[in-house]
Curated annotation (Swiss-Prot):
This is Sordarin/hypoxysordarin biosynthesis cluster protein P. The gene is sdnP. GO terms for biological process: antibiotic biosynthetic process. It comes from Sordaria araneosa (Pleurage araneosa). Part of the gene cluster that mediates the biosynthesis of sordarin and hypoxysordarin, glycoside antibiotics with a unique tetracyclic diterpene aglycone structure. First, the geranylgeranyl diphosphate synthase sdnC constructs GGDP from farnesyl diphosphate and isopentenyl diphosphate. The diterpene cyclase sdnA then catalyzes the cyclization of GGDP to afford cycloaraneosene. Cycloaraneosene is then hydroxylated four times by the putative cytochrome P450 monooxygenases sdnB, sdnE, sdnF and sdnH to give a hydroxylated cycloaraneosene derivative such as cycloaraneosene-8,9,13,19-tetraol. The chain crosses the membrane at residues 31-51, 67-87. Keywords: Antibiotic biosynthesis, Glycoprotein, Membrane, Transmembrane, Transmembrane helix. It comes from the Eukaryota. Glycans are attached at residues 6, 23, 208. It is a multi-pass membrane protein. It is found in: Membrane. One of its GO terms (cellular component) is membrane.
Length: 272
């Protein structure tokens, strides 16, 4: 890799030694700057320790898939491919001494499978907490769409920063649980903790991966997805049914399952 393409700032040749690359006698700010290119190596250890047991428990618990109306095989594939995607990326960065590598065709295929399973599970996950169901579901969709877009840009441009932005959105799994745990210290209900965890984790995932124009893309996607959901409510056309089937609109029976009255057009006009 040439120096022009080495955006991470990591050394390109030579064996990795701590004293060679980290100036331990420098000021705190200089030391932090010297270890920044190796943040991936520092992340992979805690990531594996945190995720591996949870992935195993999810795969072992078949009752979870039955409770949320989704095939166990799809859930197992989603968990497995997500773990493979994360481990593959961070391992390659580790072996390259912190250098970010561009996306390959295999990386693109793994991303497509992971996003497809995520979209499918979101479409089947009809029992999300009642708070801002549309917002949390749309955020899940945004994650998949933004990952696919970033991976496509990484393949098209060869810029490894797009690949990093795509992978770092998978860290939403960790950010969400940290935010939910943090909210337990306040006077938040479970529904509020869940909403903060899902939306907040996506924002942190974009920040973690320095997603180019991520906030603007996220806001634009949210406006489109929420308008699609609002249009499909109360309609029984083939298009509306297709949107509900694909998980892009609130299922007709969701309100009955969670025990609330479905919104009507007259009620929405009164609120407006």
């Amino acid at each position: 890799m040439s120096s022009a393409n080495n955006i991470s700032g990591a050394p390109e040749t030579g064996d990795f030694t701590f004293t060679q690359h980290f100036n331990v006698s420098a000021t705190p700010s200089e030391f932090l700057a010297s270890i920044w290119p190796y943040r991936h190596m520092m992340w992979i250890g805690p990531m594996l320790l945190f995720l591996a047991p949870r992935f195993y428990n999810t795969l072992k618990n078949t009752a979870f898939s039955r409770a949320y109306h989704m095939p166990y095989s799809i859930l197992a594939l989603h968990v497995f491919i997500s773990f493979v995607d994360l481990a593959n990326y961070h391992t390659q960065v580790f072996l390259a001494n912190g250098a970010i590598h561009p996306a390959s065709q295999i990386d693109a295929l793994i991303c497509i499978v992971q996003c497809w399973t995520s979209l499918y599970i979101t479409a089947q996950h009809h029992l999300l907490p009642k708070i801002a169901m549309e917002v949390t579901r749309a955020t899940f969709h945004c994650m998949s769409v933004q990952r696919l877009f970033a991976t496509a840009m990484a393949i098209r441009t060869g810029d490894p920063r797009w690949h990093e932005a795509s992978i770092m959105l998978l860290n939403n799994f960790i950010w969400a649980r940290l935010l939910i745990a943090y909210c337990k210290m306040g006077r938040f209900s479970w529904k509020q903790r869940y909403g903060v965890g899902i939306v907040g984790s996506h924002l942190l995932g974009m920040w973690n991966g320095t997603y180019p124009h991520g906030i603007a893309i996220y806001c634009g996607l949210m406006v489109v997805l929420l308008n699609i959901d609002g249009w499909a409510k109360g309609r029984d056309s083939s298009v509306a049914r297709a949107l509900r089937y694909l998980g892009l609109a609130t299922p007709a029976d969701w309100y009955i399952k969670v025990g609330i009255d479905p919104p009507t057009k007259s009620a929405e006009k009164k609120e407006a």
